[in-house]
Amino acid sequence: MSSCGACTCGAAAARLLTTSLTSAQRGISCGRIHVPVLGRLGTTLDAQALRRAPLRTFSETPAYFASKDGANKDGSGDGNKKSVTEGSSKKSGSGNSGKGGNQLRCPKCGDLCTHVETFVSSTRFVKCEKCHHFFVVLSEADSKKSIIKEPESAAEAVKLAFQQKPPPPPKKIYNYLDKYVVGQSFAKKVLSVAVYNHYKRIYNNIPANLRQQAEAEKQTSLTPRELEIRRREDEYRFTKLLQIAGISPHGNALGASMQQQVNQQMPQEKRGGEVLDSSQDDIKLEKSNILLLGPTGSGKTLLAQTLAKCLDVPFAICDCTTLTQAGYVGEDIESVIAKLLQDANYNVEKAQQGIVFLDEVDKIGSVPGIHQLRDVGGEGVQQGLLKLLEGTIVNVPEKNSRKLRGETVQVDTTNVLFVASGAFNGLDRIISRRKNEKYLGFGTPSNLGKGRRAAAAADLANRSGESNTHQDIEEKDRLLRHVEARDLIEFGMIPEFVGRLPVVVPLHSLDEKTLVQILTEPRNAVIPQYQALFSMDKCELNVTEDALKAIARLALERKTGARGLRSIMEKLLLEPMFEVPNSDIVCVEVDKEVVEGKKEPGYIRAPSKESSEEEYDSGVEEDGWPRQADAANS
């Protein structure tokens, strides 16, 4: 051992060294020297002195201690975390025996601890005279700096939230969607039930690990001494203790050992013969992904946007038109989960319980043709989404990190619910061909499917011809209600992709009555939006009932659904929105003839200042005649 001339810790180190064991892993460092507290003893110690020395161990952990090799010298296997507890007084004395106002108790035996005399004004070393253990005391100020509140796991958070505030029932979600979306009652019921079951699946699947851990702890056999140690540990614990891995001021060596102990305490999954011998097993609820299909402007995206506002889980809306296969220019498939992680504020545990809405999924349908060697934006994207829909671990780039650095976060999509939607233009023609197939000789069908583009072209050609709009809508809705998986496969979706979307929900087209309701009834309706625009210029907008029906008929003829309403309103109100600002117009009236283009919108103007002054003067003169008559009579 090297000597220290002016250092005050030399005597303390020498005293500790004389009462040590024959091996240890650490030492006391001070200034210019490093004195091993429990080092391998050579010939420097007398053998008789070593036999007379009591059995002691030393721990440098601020809030825990760990015996050497994780076990006591009596073989009781006490490698758990311990703390030095304080008595009634908060202020710790320096160099006192601990019998006054400051009382530090040993976490192993509960006996009083005494401070080690080191000729220093303040010491953090205490020892227990009964079990001969040394400890490092962490002050209250240091504990506030070092002890950080450990975030509870996502499973505990979900379980606690489920107990305190149960998930909204499907009827409540349905009523909320009804305030913003008109019609589509079947689709709203399916989404409401799917969201509610998603909450229940999270509550059922994730806390199962906690229950298994509790059962494993109960089955662990403990000796009476270990039970006594645990009882005293709970009795004298004075603060919440922190997992020491990675934050110990003395390094990560002790933290690594603690992490290994935690990993050993985690319940292990049953393997091999244990699965065969087990008599019962927990039911794991699997997810049912949803596919929404319907004409454009029927409310598919609006349903998703409205649903995202009322959920307590992360919700991400992703556009499939920009996705490409890995290695090509465009967005990677992992960007779908990256958006979900961003919505969860980069909380991985929370993102693994979210909902992903895949919009425009029909645009990734494969296009048949021998001229195309590789469909990177169609079938390649579907193949990349297969494991994502079923459940896999996705490597998502970290926040503020480039892709080339390789800094990724692993996200498990097993409990992520996927809702896909698409217009699927021409799908009704494919269903019609399937239902009206005519067979030639040897069972060969006369009308073979030609894929997505041929079906869409046939549907567009049918729209261009003159036909009854109401009959076309009814026929299309009737056919979509009979959609099957083989129709989607003929459209261009691969069978593996269709099989991972078991719930298929067709949305019906919007009729005239529904379009009139969309104009006025929802909270974010079209007519109230334009009325708010005119009210900013201190002007009113009045639209008659006949005008609303005429606007709905125009939208039906355009066959663009509810999106056609806004374009019609923009065209009708272009001139009024140009004339009203900085004018005397106080009201704009729109009737049926204005919608049909037979006349211009009507304006109601405020009276000018000169006319109002003349009317006021004439009114004063008229009021003056009775006064003069009364004065004359009096």
Swiss-Prot record:
Modified residues (Phosphoserine): 618
Positions that bind Zn(2+): 106, 109, 128, 131
Residues covered by the ClpX-type ZB domain: 94-147
Transit sequence range: 1-56
EC number(s) recorded for this UniProt protein: 3.6.4.10
Annotated segments matching region Disordered: 69-102, 599-634
A Pfam family matched in the record: ClpB_D2-small
Primary localization class, coarse: mitochondrion
Record-listed ATP binding positions: 295-302
Compositionally skewed regions (Low complexity) per UniProt: 85-94
MF annotations from Gene Ontology: ATP binding; ATP hydrolysis activity; ATP-dependent peptidase activity; ATP-dependent protein folding chaperone; peptidase activator activity; protein dimerization activity; unfolded protein binding; zinc ion binding
Biological process, per Gene Ontology: ATP metabolic process; proteolysis involved in protein catabolic process
Role according to the record: ATP-dependent chaperone that functions as an unfoldase. As part of the ClpXP protease complex, it recognizes specific protein substrates, unfolds them using energy derived from ATP hydrolysis, and then translocates them to the proteolytic subunit (CLPP) of the ClpXP complex for degradation. Thanks to its chaperone activity, it also functions in the incorporation of the pyridoxal phosphate cofactor into 5-aminolevulinate synthase, thereby activating 5-aminolevulinate (ALA) synthesis, the first step in heme biosynthesis.
Superkingdom classification of source: Eukaryota
Compositionally biased tracts (Acidic residues): 612-623
Enzyme class, spelled out: hydrolase
Similarity remark: Belongs to the ClpX chaperone family.
InterPro entries, per database record: AAA+_ATPase (IPR003593), ATP-dep_Clp_protease_ClpX (IPR050052), ATPase_AAA_core (IPR003959), Clp_ATPase_C (IPR019489), Clp_protease_ATP-bd_su_ClpX (IPR004487), P-loop_NTPase (IPR027417), Znf_CppX_C4 (IPR010603)
Protein name (record): ATP-dependent clpX-like chaperone, mitochondrial
Keywords, sorted A to Z: Acetylation, ATP-binding, Chaperone, Hydrolase, Metal-binding, Mitochondrion, Mitochondrion nucleoid, Nucleotide-binding, Phosphoprotein, Transit peptide, Zinc
Catalyzed reaction equations: ATP + H2O = ADP + phosphate + H(+)
Annotated Gene Ontology cellular component terms: cytosol; endopeptidase Clp complex; mitochondrial endopeptidase Clp complex; mitochondrial inner membrane; mitochondrial matrix; mitochondrial nucleoid; mitochondrion; nucleoplasm
Cross-referenced CDD domains: RecA-like_ClpX (cd19497)
SUPFAM superfamilies: P-loop containing nucleoside triphosphate hydrolases (SSF52540)
Subcellular location per the Swiss-Prot or TrEMBL entry: Mitochondrion; Mitochondrion matrix, Mitochondrion nucleoid
Biased composition (Basic and acidic residues): 70-84, 599-611
